[in-house]
């Protein structure tokens, strides 16, 4: 939910730019326009490095999440309610990499917004909506893993395709409704009209959000976060108990049904562990930004610009992390990537390829 200059905070670059507006030596975003924002680009060396780092994140988010979606949707063996939820999460991260990160890269490096007022608002809406969607998806995924680990044998009857579709629909509808209502109703700027007018300039894309909406935004992050932490704490305890039971049973002669249950439980615990790492990565990426945005709004926006930019891009990079996590922990994903990049998925009946060799 952060876009730097079009985030839930006042764009600190823009605020500093206004302070320098009267300086005749300042470089402007639009040299021939009145009320132009001050441009504050980096020197050539750091500029090239920043473009490379930010651009790599955007490319990785787009390509990595596209591979996740392609793998799950193409290979029939991956067609499950839980995996469709993961594919929908990948779609949200893919859209962050496609519609948000490239434009934020230019803004962060050049210090100006060159993409017009209309896309400024859309960019902010996309940022808020897609990042909110990621939060809700991860929350539902954690609940799914809890059901799978707590009782793996009846799990298929509880988390059905219908339940998965409802979770996906809720995640997208709520996040998009929230994002667009926040930006286009103007409610977030209530009480800040004079400040907005004073800080508006050509080449800027800042969003003012009053304390009430900052608090609402923080709650929309905090509540799902608490759910995820609680659920994964329970998953950890259940997994520990199951491991102890399996160790005891290994010393005895187990029935075939018990052996099957153990195999299913082991598989579900591994999936829960992998997705738990994805949730932990999400929290580590986004928690610093949300804490800063909440505190900053009530202390007069005191965060230094460079600190704010670092927090924003750490959060953005989360959209590129999940495919790396899947590739590291899931052999089936590595095999699916190999089949995709080599073009073998274009072959007839490739969708029936066995990705889980015994």
From Swiss-Prot:
Transmembrane segment boundaries: 48-68, 84-104, 122-143, 167-187, 213-233, 275-295, 310-333
Gene behind this protein: Taar7e
Membrane topology classification: Multi-pass membrane protein
Sites where a glycan is attached: 34, 210
Alphabetized UniProt keyword annotations: Cell membrane, Disulfide bond, G-protein coupled receptor, Glycoprotein, Membrane, Receptor, Transducer, Transmembrane, Transmembrane helix
Signal peptide, first to last residue: none
Compartments where located: Cell membrane
Protein name: Trace amine-associated receptor 7e
Residue intervals annotated with topology Cytoplasmic: 69-83, 144-166, 234-274, 334-358
């Amino acid at each position: 939910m952060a876009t730097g200059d079009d985030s839930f905070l006042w764009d600190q670059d823009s605020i500093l730019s206004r302070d320098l507006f009267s300086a005749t030596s300042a470089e402007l975003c639009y040299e021939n326009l009145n009320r132009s924002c001050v441009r504050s680009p980096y020197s050539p060396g750091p500029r090239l490095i920043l473009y490379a780092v930010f651009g790599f994140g955007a490319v990785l988010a787009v390509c990595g999440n596209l591979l996740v979606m392609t793998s799950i949707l193409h290979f029939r063996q991956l067609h499950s309610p839980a995996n469709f939820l993961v594919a929908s999460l990948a779609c949200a991260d893919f859209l962050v990499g496609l519609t948000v990160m490239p434009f934020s890269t230019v803004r962060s490096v050049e210090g100006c917004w060159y993409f017009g007022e209309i896309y400024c608002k859309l960019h902010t809406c996309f940022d808020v909506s897609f990042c909110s969607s990621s939060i809700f998806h991860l929350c539902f995924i954690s609940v799914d893993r809890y059901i799978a680990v707590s009782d793996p044998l009846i799990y298929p009857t509880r988390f059905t395709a219908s339940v998965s579709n409802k979770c996906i629909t809720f995640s997208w509808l709520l996040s998009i409704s929230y994002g667009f209502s926040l930006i286009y109703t103007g409610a977030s700027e209530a009480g800040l009209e004079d400040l907005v007018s004073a800080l508006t300039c050509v080449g800027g894309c800042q969003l003012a959000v009053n304390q009430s909406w900052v608090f609402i935004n923080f709650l929309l992050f905090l509540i799902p976060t608490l759910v995820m932490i609680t659920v994964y704490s329970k998953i950890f305890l259940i997994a520990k108990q199951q491991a102890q039971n399996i160790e005891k049973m290994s010393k005895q002669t187990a029935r075939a049904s018990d052996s099957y249950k153990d195999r299913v439980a082991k598989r579900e615990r591994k999936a829960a562990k992998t997705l738990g790492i994805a949730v932990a990565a999400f929290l580590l990426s986004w928690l610093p930004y949300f804490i800063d945005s909440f505190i900053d709004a009530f202390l007069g926006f005191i965060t230094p610009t460079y600190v704010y930019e670092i927090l924003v891009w750490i959060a953005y990079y989360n959209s590129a992390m999940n495919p790396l996590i899947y590739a590291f922990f899931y052999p089936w994903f590595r095999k699916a990537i190999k089949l995709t990049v080599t073009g073998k998925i274009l072959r007839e009946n490739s969708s029936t390829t066995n990705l889980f060799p015994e």
